[in-house]
Structures are given as C-alpha cells and as structure tokens.
C-alpha cells in the first residue's frame, strides 16, 4: 500500500523531531517477531520513556539527516525498528537487549550515541550505563564519604579525652 507524499513528509518530520530530542538510538531487526510480542515490547518501551518506531528505511534515512544519528544511516537495511531513549541514554539499550534475550528472532543491528555509531556487540557499553538516579546516588556517596570521615575524626577527640580521664581516675583509685 502506497503512502501519500504528505504522509511521508509528516512521518519524516515526526521521526526527525524525536531523533533531535533523543539521547541515544538503538536499531534492531524485528523479522519473525509476532505482533503480540511487538505489542509487549511497545508497552515496556512506553513505561521506560523509549520511543519505538517502525519506519521505511528510505524515510528513516531522511529523518535522521541533520541529527546526531546521521551516522547510523547504513544500518537501515531490512525490517528495522528504531528505539530512541528520551530520558535515560541506556534505557533503549537495556530494553532491547533484554527483549533480544527472550526472543531469538529479534536481532540488534547497531546503536548510536553522541554522533558515533557503535556495533551491536557494544550494546553492553550503553546498557550498563547507570540511570540518572543511580548516578546521582553514586555521586552523593562519593561526596558524603569525606564528610563522614571528618565527623568520625572530630568525634574521636572527645572520646580520647574521656578515655584518658577515665584512665587517670582508675589509676588514682588503685593508688588510693
């Protein structure tokens, strides 16, 4: 079924807008995946702020022009699904990596981050990135460690004085 030119332009504009706001892109081959399985994937994607699009390859190539994902143009071959991470750079990678483990017909082709295209074998690099909340928690623990150590050190001074006074008291009681 042919798509009208106006519809094609609208699809390209919509995907281009999504791509310009996205933090990362994962490209996968969905050949052989049932529609029920795809519906499950879409539901999981919505929950994790990942935008999934199935677009014709020629339209996808035009849509990524002028964005940082232009480097991924050669990966648009065969049945392709585009997964854009909107809030967390690793969200789409984690989602599709887990989905590919469950569905052996689903294959990750490539991923792109910051204008650099990475192979499917490097999906772990992106999937292992901590979420924003995890990164903030790590940063806070690193920042809190010196303060905690200082508080313990300052708390140790009165403890030492107390132990010294107790030792002097015990010594005087023994002498008396």
From Swiss-Prot:
Lineage: superkingdom: Bacteria
SUBUNIT field: Part of the ribosomal stalk of the 50S ribosomal subunit. The N-terminus interacts with L11 and the large rRNA to form the base of the stalk. The C-terminus forms an elongated spine to which L12 dimers bind in a sequential fashion forming a multimeric L10(L12)X complex.
Protein name per the record: Large ribosomal subunit protein uL10
InterPro entries: Ribosomal_uL10 (IPR001790), Ribosomal_uL10-like_sf (IPR043141), Ribosomal_uL10_bac (IPR022973), Ribosomal_uL10_bac_type (IPR047865)
Organism in which the protein naturally occurs: Hahella chejuensis (strain KCTC 2396)
Lineage: Bacteria, Pseudomonadati, Pseudomonadota, Gammaproteobacteria, Oceanospirillales
GO biological process: translation
Gene Ontology molecular functions: large ribosomal subunit rRNA binding
Family that this chain belongs to: Belongs to the universal ribosomal protein uL10 family.
One Gene Ontology cellular component: ribosome
Alphabetical list of CDD domains matching this protein: Ribosomal_L10
Keywords, comma-separated and alphabetical: Ribonucleoprotein, Ribosomal protein, RNA-binding, rRNA-binding
Cross-referenced Pfam families: Ribosomal_L10 (PF00466)
């Amino acid at each position: 079924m042919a798509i009208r030119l106006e519809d094609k332009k609208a699809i390209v504009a919509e995907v281009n807008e999504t791509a310009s706001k996205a933090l990362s892109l994962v490209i996968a081959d969905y050949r052989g995946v049932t529609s029920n399985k795809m519906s499950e994937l879409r539901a999981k994607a919505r929950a994790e702020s990942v935008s999934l699009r199935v677009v014709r390859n020629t339209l996808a190539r035009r849509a990524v022009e002028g964005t940082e994902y232009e480097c991924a143009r050669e990966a648009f071959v065969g049945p392709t699904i585009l997964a854009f991470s909107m809030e967390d750079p690793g969200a789409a990678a984690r989602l599709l990596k887990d989905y590919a483990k469950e569905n052996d017909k689903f294959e990750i082709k490539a991923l792109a981050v910051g204008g650099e295209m990475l192979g499917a074998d490097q999906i772990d690099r992106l999937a292992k990135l901590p979420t924003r909340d995890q990164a903030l928690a790590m940063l806070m623990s690193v920042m809190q460690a010196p303060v905690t150590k200082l508080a313990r050190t300052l708390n140790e001074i009165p403890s030492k004085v107390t132990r010294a006074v107790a030792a002097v008291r015990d010594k005087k009681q023994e002498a008396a």
